[in-house]
Regions:
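ATP/NTP phosphate-donor binding region
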Residues: 1-10
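Short acidic, glycine-rich surface-loop motifs adjacent to enzyme active sites
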Residues: 12-27, 166-180
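Short coil/turn connectors at secondary-structure junctions
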Residues: 13-17, 40-44, 75-79, 84-85, ...
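Short beta-strand segments
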Residues: 20-22, 46-49, 81-85, 150, ...
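Short Gly/Thr/Asp-enriched flexible loops that form oxyanion-binding sites at enzyme active sites
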Residues: 20-42, 182-193
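Short amphipathic alpha-helical segments and helix-helix/interface helices
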Residues: 35, 69, 160-161, 191-198
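Internal gly/pro-rich beta-alpha loop/helix module
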Residues: 47-117
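Accessory alpha-helical/coil subdomains and C-terminal extensions
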Residues: 90-183, 190
Length: 200
């Protein structure tokens, strides 16, 4: 992430936009990281890749690259996004959902920025033009001491205390729309552990 960020920053003044070719398995992680490392960019930073390699006769690489360039050249494109399978998705909202299909990525809890059909970019209207109110901001570090914990039924609440020595923060991936264990001895222990994190 930092190397990609550095290359973009080094060439930012000399280019109108950027297209980054990337493997699909970790592309959404890179897009999210770049979205926080490079904020309020009036220039587009587009990530793309393919499900099948360029040499495959049925590859999606050429179309994805073409559509990414088309999107990056559009005057209304800005910030970090993924263009893949005819869809432009905000960098902070993309998730790889399918491992075989050409429409591999979905936009989580937010509509796609745009669809690309027959050389036309059809925008959803919610992700407007860059207003230019804030200059682009570059950040040069990411705290590696952040842990993402996916809660599962029966999770041992002691895991939060075990993580406290090695991490500065824990992001809880909770049930449904934010539910955490509440009842019984396990629920109480879990909530106490959360309060210890909040108070520290």
């Amino acid at each position: 992430w930092m190397r990609i960020r550095d290359v973009i920053v080094e060439g930012y003044a000399d280019h109108d936009g950027f297209v980054v070719l990337h493997g699909t398995d970790t592309m959404s992680y890179t897009a999210a990281a770049l979205s926080y490392l490079i904020q309020d960019s009036p220039k587009p930073i587009v990530l793309t890749g393919s499900q099948k390699p360029m040499g495959n006769p049925f590859t999606d690489a050429k179309l994805n690259l073409y559509q990414s360039l088309l999107y990056a050249l559009d005057e209304h494109s800005h910030d970090v996004s993924i263009v893949f399978g005819g869809v432009a998705i905000a960098g902070t909202r993309a998730r790889k959902q399918r491992t075989m299909s050409f429409n591999a990525f979905i936009s989580v809890n937010y509509p796609p920025i745009a669809y690309i059909r027959n050389d036309r970019i059809v925008r959803n209207g919610l992700h407007g033009m860059h207003q230019g109110e804030n200059p682009v901001r570059f950040y040069d570090n990411i705290d590696p001491r952040v842990f993402v914990l996916k809660l599962t039924p029966g999770v041992n609440p002691g895991i939060l205390d075990a993580l406290a020595d090695s991490y500065d923060a824990v992001i809880l991936e909770t049930f449904g729309i934010g539910g955490i264990p509440e009842f019984g001895e396990s629920g109480e222990s879990f909530q106490e552990a959360i309060f210890r994190w909040v108070d520290s």
